[in-house]
């Protein structure tokens, strides 16, 4: 997005997020995967829209985030950016780098990050990992691409850990996570997501870093919160983890609307003369 457009619209930037942390303003993040929802989120005033690799789950029906590709992420990101640009152009758009798009080499990671940025004008990319990706984060940020980190429960490593349980509950893992958070900051990350870790640890990390710490299942002491929009809107009645607050029950609302539509079509009540030409 062009600088003059950012200035006119109050577009959220990495600098703005840092100011929010310093001023004690909480940062609100939601995932988004399409044009229509992105327009709604931007108009509602959301700070950051994360084009998450969770699209692999909620859009494609996979059981993990691993199958989604760079091309598919670009497809979703392009739609989200267009949605934001057609609304108020305020929200920052951050795009997940999918599994194996940055693990092979620094060069491959930079190429994919550059492609994601160039092909749809997003604001930043997000990567999972600590010390193992620190050099890659540095390489990408040195090229002018902002990077958001992700620690704690890392869905792309689900087969390594074997479960979605809370991470860093014991001293050694908690200490390692703290070191990784500091290392990501030193490597140039502008923010870091911490997922499903003890709230006390998340608060300690937030206080020890100068960059924003965004929590998901990590307690209220983080600098901001992120949720998958499908979860907080109640679109999947079978999935309701402890850390999700459900703000609507769209599953029931949509089922009811479809049921009434079916009834009206089959009875001949729809379309009415007023709805016909």
UniProtKB/Swiss-Prot annotation:
<dbReference type="InterPro" id="IPR015813">
    <property type="entry name" value="Pyrv/PenolPyrv_kinase-like_dom"/>
</dbReference>
<keyword id="KW-0566">Pantothenate biosynthesis</keyword>
<comment type="subunit">
    <text>Homodecamer; pentamer of dimers.</text>
</comment>
<comment type="pathway">
    <text>Cofactor biosynthesis; (R)-pantothenate biosynthesis; (R)-pantoate from 3-methyl-2-oxobutanoate: step 1/2.</text>
</comment>
<feature type="binding site">
    <location>
        <position position="96"/>
    </location>
    <ligand>
        <name>3-methyl-2-oxobutanoate</name>
    </ligand>
</feature>
<feature type="binding site">
    <location>
        <position position="128"/>
    </location>
    <ligand>
        <name>Mg(2+)</name>
    </ligand>
</feature>
<comment type="similarity">
    <text>Belongs to the PanB family.</text>
</comment>
<dbReference type="InterPro" id="IPR040442">
    <property type="entry name" value="Pyrv_kinase-like_dom_sf"/>
</dbReference>
<dbReference type="GO" id="GO:0015940">
    <property type="term" value="P:pantothenate biosynthetic process"/>
</dbReference>
<keyword id="KW-0963">Cytoplasm</keyword>
<feature type="active site" description="Proton acceptor">
    <location>
        <position position="195"/>
    </location>
</feature>
<dbReference type="Pfam" id="PF02548">
    <property type="entry name" value="Pantoate_transf"/>
</dbReference>
<keyword id="KW-0460">Magnesium</keyword>
<keyword id="KW-0479">Metal-binding</keyword>
<dbReference type="GO" id="GO:0005737">
    <property type="term" value="C:cytoplasm"/>
</dbReference>
<feature type="binding site">
    <location>
        <begin position="53"/>
        <end position="54"/>
    </location>
    <ligand>
        <name>3-methyl-2-oxobutanoate</name>
    </ligand>
</feature>
<protein>
    <recommendedName>
        <fullName>3-methyl-2-oxobutanoate hydroxymethyltransferase</fullName>
        <ecNumber>2.1.2.11</ecNumber>
    </recommendedName>
</protein>
<feature type="binding site">
    <location>
        <position position="96"/>
    </location>
    <ligand>
        <name>Mg(2+)</name>
    </ligand>
</feature>
<dbReference type="InterPro" id="IPR003700">
    <property type="entry name" value="Pantoate_hydroxy_MeTrfase"/>
</dbReference>
<comment type="function">
    <text>Catalyzes the reversible reaction in which hydroxymethyl group from 5,10-methylenetetrahydrofolate is transferred onto alpha-ketoisovalerate to form ketopantoate.</text>
</comment>
<dbReference type="GO" id="GO:0000287">
    <property type="term" value="F:magnesium ion binding"/>
</dbReference>
<feature type="binding site">
    <location>
        <position position="126"/>
    </location>
    <ligand>
        <name>3-methyl-2-oxobutanoate</name>
    </ligand>
</feature>
<feature type="binding site">
    <location>
        <position position="53"/>
    </location>
    <ligand>
        <name>Mg(2+)</name>
    </ligand>
</feature>
<dbReference type="GO" id="GO:0003864">
    <property type="term" value="F:3-methyl-2-oxobutanoate hydroxymethyltransferase activity"/>
</dbReference>
<keyword id="KW-0808">Transferase</keyword>
